[in-house]
C-alpha cells in the first residue's frame, strides 16, 4: 500500500468516551511516511491509546519499524505472564501481582526522561481475560474541581523505584504533579500508584490523604478503556496522556512483545 492510499483510508473510531481509538485503513507493512507519522502522533496525543487489529501475529521487525512512526525506539523485548515458567519469553517477569503491572502506572516516572510511549503486540493472547486497561490523565484532570486543579498545579511529586524490587536500576526523580501535552495543550495528571512516593512539601497526613484521593480518582471507570487481546492485536499508548494496568485474571498463557518509544523530560 502506498502512503497516499493509506492516508485517504485511515480512520479513527473511539472505543470509549474520553480515551482510546481503533485505527483502520493501515497495514503493519506500511513504509515510513512523514505525513502519516504526524497524523498518527497527533491522534496518539488526542486519544491517548490507539488499537490496531492486523489479523495475524506482528513480527518483531514489523513492530519495531511501526514504532518509528512515533519516535525513536528501544530494542524489542517480550514478556509472558502465565502459569508455566517454561513458556516465558523473558524470565524477568513471572507474575502480574509480583511485578505490580496490575496497578495503575506510567512507565519510568522515577527517571528524568520517562518513555514517551510503547507498542505492545500479542504473541500468544490469553484464552479469556488478561486485558490491558488504560486511563486518561487528561479526563481525570478535567474532572477535578477548580480548587483541586489549582492545588495540584502548584505541587511536585517524588517518584521512586525503591519500592518496586523488579526494577534493577534504582532511581528517584521529582516531576510536576500536573504536566502539559505539547500537541493538544491539555493538562495531564502525572501521579501514579506504583511509583509516586509523595507530594513535595506536604506533611505526612496531608500527603497520604491527597495521594489516596488522586489514586482513587484515577480508578473511576469513566476514564478507562480496555484492550482485550487476540491474535493480531497491537496497541500504541502515550505514556503521559494515559496510565495503564494489566488485568491479572485470565485463562491460558499471556505472551506480549513490547517496543518502548524514548521520551524527554515532562514539563508543566
Residue ranges and their predicted role:
Residues 2-234, 239-268:
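Non-heme Fe(II) oxygenase catalytic core, chiefly the N-lobe of the double-stranded beta-helix
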Amino acid at each position: 500500500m502506498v502512503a497516499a492510499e493509506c492516508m485517504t483510508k485511515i480512520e479513527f473510531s473511539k472505543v470509549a468516551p474520553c480515551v482510546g481509538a481503533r485505527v483502520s485503513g493501515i497495514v503493519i507493512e506500511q513504509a515510513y511516511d512523514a505525513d502519516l507519522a504526524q497524523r498518527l502522533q497527533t491522534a496518539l496525543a488526542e486519544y491517548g491509546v490507539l488499537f490496531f487489529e492486523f489479523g495475524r501475529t506482528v513480527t518483531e521487525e514489523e513492530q519495531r519499524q511501526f514504532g518509528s512512526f512515533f519516535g525513536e525506539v528501544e530494542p524489542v523485548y517480550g514478556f509472558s505472564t502465565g502459569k508455566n515458567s517454561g513458556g516465558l519469553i523473558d524470565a524477568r517477569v513471572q507474575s502480574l501481582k509480583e511485578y505490580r503491572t496490575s496497578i495503575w502506572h506510567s512507565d519510568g516516572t522515577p527517571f528524568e526522561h520517562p518513555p514517551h510511549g510503547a507498542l505492545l503486540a500479542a504473541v500468544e493472547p490469553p484464552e479469556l481475560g488478561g486485558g490491558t486497561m488504560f486511563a486518561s490523565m487528561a479526563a481525570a484532570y478535567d474532572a477535578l474541581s477548580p480548587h483541586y486543579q489549582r492545588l495540584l498545579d502548584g505541587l511536585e511529586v517524588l517518584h521512586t523505584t525503591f519500592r518496586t524490587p523488579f526494577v534493577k536500576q534504582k532511581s528517584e526523580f521529582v516531576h510536576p504533579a500536573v504536566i502539559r501535552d505539547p500537541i493538544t495543550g491539555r493538562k495531564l495528571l502525572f501521579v501514579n500508584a506504583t511509583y509516586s512516593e509523595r507530594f513535595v512539601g506536604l506533611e505526612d497526613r496531608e500527603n497520604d490523604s491527597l495521594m489516596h484521593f488522586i489514586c482513587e480518582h484515577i480508578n473511576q471507570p469513566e476514564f478507562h478503556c480496555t484492550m482485550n487481546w487476540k491474535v493480531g492485536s497491537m496497541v500504541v499508548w502515550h505514556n503521559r496522556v494515559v496510565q495503564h494496568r494489566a488485568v491479572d485474571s485470565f485463562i491460558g498463557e499471556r505472551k506480549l512483545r513490547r517496543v518502548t518509544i524514548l521520551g524527554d523530560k515532562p514539563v508543566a
